[in-house]
């Protein structure tokens, strides 16, 4: 066992003394059992994580019952909804790297035999997956689960995205103060990750098809008995996998990454999943080309349209059969998935999900009646984004296949929000928000406030937004993000000027500014070099080391420094 490194031999008597002092070892024979880390992310200010202490206690009990010794540690967490629209959002994506580094540190410093990961929200889930790929110790994931959808006084289904869009609607005068306050009080009724197909739930669903969780991980409610039983069963399975030496990199292969993107397409997941899944591939040692994602989109039908793209919540998806029903449906179309891959259950993806039929065809469409024949995400290329950009086509009105408009440029999120709120932004505009990428932001903040304000003001079909920043999973509308290279790295988005004509072509997956190359070349000659906005602390180090969105926004040490 790995843990023998800290508990076997006379020279480790001091370490054994310290281990006895923890109270986790009930008898001398416990030294012969596997040591299992519980990597938790309990935190009081994140509603998706307030219940994770209870779930960790269930995991501990089950791990002991299975014949191993549990040791819990915690990571940090950032609530993107609370951190939105101010300096806190600069820390959201960078927190993913802190989580990965912290988990790696504890796991490797103490030579654990296996790890039980309990994530739930936004950057915590991918951060823990990065740690699992990096340490490659037998592991299993069981997230905290989604919250129930809210309900307004008028019986309207609510999610957090409803609340963000309500801000724009209230400013526009289209809803009353009473309606606004009612929504605020009822949009998030329970603990759990926000109820729609936002980043947290997107990643928790993708973990199912990656093979890192038990079935229904992505949709079973946080407050359900099923969630608690899932924790128990996952703990038993982890101890079994430790004995069988089944490791994360045995499970997360290139084919698994393909299948994660296929499920993402079928469910119209958050654009952030592209960023995180590319980072996971990078950590697993898999060289993954963005062009591959478009090929997957072309062969994968869009089967389940979930909030913010519809009124359906994650609980509705669960009641309709959950992720297993979607996987089962996709397996019926040859070449869409790689179903004979091994998963943490010890069974293949096919064995886990075969026969799990759709229970509600309104929520999950069958193969012969999809929302669209192609997936809900697209990678765009062109002279604005030579290394790619991402759009959630499932969140765009189906009538829009191309959009051409006049650029109105902003060098920060806050400038853009002010212009939208004071009606400087009008129908026919393409809002360009730049210097908000991983390096430029720094931290690649989410542009939920401007996109929500555009939709809330009734301009969702008349105004587009493009950015080297990213979006919340709650974003909908004509919103193109992750433009690479970013402006701070000299990307072409920095060369756009007010009034330039920009075309977003969803059919051909292109993003172009309609200016001759010689004009863009002259503009580049006069471009002012980017200077880092933050000079001290973690964000300064992050700015120095982070890569562009097309590589997952991971941190890499330059070769000349190694």
Curated annotation (Swiss-Prot):
Query: Please, which domain of life does this record's source organism belong to?
Result: Bacteria
For this protein's source organism, the top of the classification is: Bacteria, Bacillati, Bacillota, Bacilli, Bacillales
List of residues that carry N6-carboxylysine: 123
Which residues are named in the active-site annotation? 472 (proton acceptor)
**PROSITE patterns in alphabetical order:** ILVD_EDD_1, ILVD_EDD_2
Entry-linked InterPro entries: Dihydro-acid_dehy_C, DihydroxyA_deHydtase, DiOHA_6PGluconate_deHydtase_CS, ILV_EDD_C, ILV_EDD_N, IlvD/EDD_N
Q: Which organism is it from?
A: Staphylococcus aureus (strain USA300 / TCH1516)
Cite the GO molecular-function annotations of the record: 2 iron, 2 sulfur cluster binding; dihydroxy-acid dehydratase activity; magnesium ion binding
User: Where does this protein hold [2Fe-2S] cluster?
Assistant: 121, 194
**This chain belongs to which protein, by name?**
Dihydroxy-acid dehydratase
Q: What cofactor does this protein call for? A: [2Fe-2S] cluster; Mg(2+)
Cofactor-binding details, from the entry: Binds 1 [2Fe-2S] cluster per subunit. This cluster acts as a Lewis acid cofactor.
């Amino acid at each position: 066992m790995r843990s023998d490194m800290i508990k076997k031999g006379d020279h480790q008597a001091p370490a054994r003394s310290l281990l006895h002092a923890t109270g986790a070892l009930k008898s001398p024979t416990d030294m012969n059992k596997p040591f299992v880390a519980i990597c938790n992310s309990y935190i009081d200010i994140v509603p998706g994580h307030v219940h994770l202490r209870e779930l960790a206690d269930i995991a501990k009990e089950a791990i002991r019952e299975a014949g191993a010794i549990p040791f819990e540690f915690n990571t940090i967490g950032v609530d993107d909804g609370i951190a939105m629209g101010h300096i806190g959002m600069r820390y959201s994506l960078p927190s993913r790297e802190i989580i990965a580094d912290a988990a790696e540190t504890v796991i490797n410093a103490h030579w654990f035999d296996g790890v039980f990961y309990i994530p739930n929200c936004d950057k915590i889930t991918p951060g823990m997956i990065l740690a699992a790929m990096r340490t490659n110790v037998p592991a299993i994931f069981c997230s905290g689960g989604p919250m129930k959808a809210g309900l307004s006084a008028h019986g309207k289904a609510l999610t957090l995205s409803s609340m963000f869009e309500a801000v724009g609607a209230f400013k526009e005068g289209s809803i009353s103060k009473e309606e606004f306050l009612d929504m605020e009080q009822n949009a998030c009724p329970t603990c759990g990750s926000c109820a729609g197909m936002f980043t947290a739930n997107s990643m928790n669903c993708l973990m199912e098809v990656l093979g890192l969780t038990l079935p229904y991980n992505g949709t079973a409610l946080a407050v359900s008995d099923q969630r608690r039983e899932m924790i128990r069963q996952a703990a038993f399975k982890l101890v079994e996998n430790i004995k069988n030496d089944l490791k994360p990199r045995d499970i997360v292969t290139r084919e698994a990454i393909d299948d994660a993107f296929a499920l993402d397409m079928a469910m119209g997941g958050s654009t952030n999943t592209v960023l995180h899944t590319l980072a996971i591939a990078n950590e697993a040692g898999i060289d993954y080309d963005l062009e591959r994602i478009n090929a997957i989109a072309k062969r994968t039908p869009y089967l389940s349209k979930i909030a913010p793209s519809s009124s359906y919540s994650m609980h509705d998806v669960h009641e309709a059969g959950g992720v297993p029903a979607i996987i089962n449906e996709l397996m019926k179309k040859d070449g869409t998935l790689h179903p004979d891959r091994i998963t943490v259950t010890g069974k293949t993806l096919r064995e886990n999900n075969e026969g799990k039929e759709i229970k509600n065809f309104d929520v999950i469409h069958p193969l012969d009646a999809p929302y669209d024949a192609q997936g809900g995400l697209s990678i765009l290329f062109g002279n604005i984004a030579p290394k790619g950009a991402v759009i959630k086509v499932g969140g765009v009105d189906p009538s829009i296949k191309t959009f051409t408009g006049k650029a109105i440029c902003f060098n920060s999120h806050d400038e853009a929000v002010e212009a939208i709120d004071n009606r400087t932004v009008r129908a026919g505009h393409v809002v360009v928000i730049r210097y908000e990428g991983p390096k430029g932001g720094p931290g690649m903040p989410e542009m939920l406030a401007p996109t929500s304000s555009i939709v809330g003001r009734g301009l969702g079909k008349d105004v587009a937004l493009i950015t080297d920043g990213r979006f919340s999973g709650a974003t909908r509308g004509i919103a193109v993000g992750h433009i690479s290279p970013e402006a701070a790295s000299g990307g072409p988005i920095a060369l756009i000027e007010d009034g330039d004509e920009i075309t977003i072509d969803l059919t051909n997956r292109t993003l172009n500014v309609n200016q001759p190359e010689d004009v863009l070349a002259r503009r580049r000659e006069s471009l002012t070099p980017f200077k880092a906005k933050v000079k001290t602390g973690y964000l300064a180090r992050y700015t120095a080391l982070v890569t562009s969105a097309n590589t997952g926004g991971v941190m890499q040490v330059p070769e000349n420094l190694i």
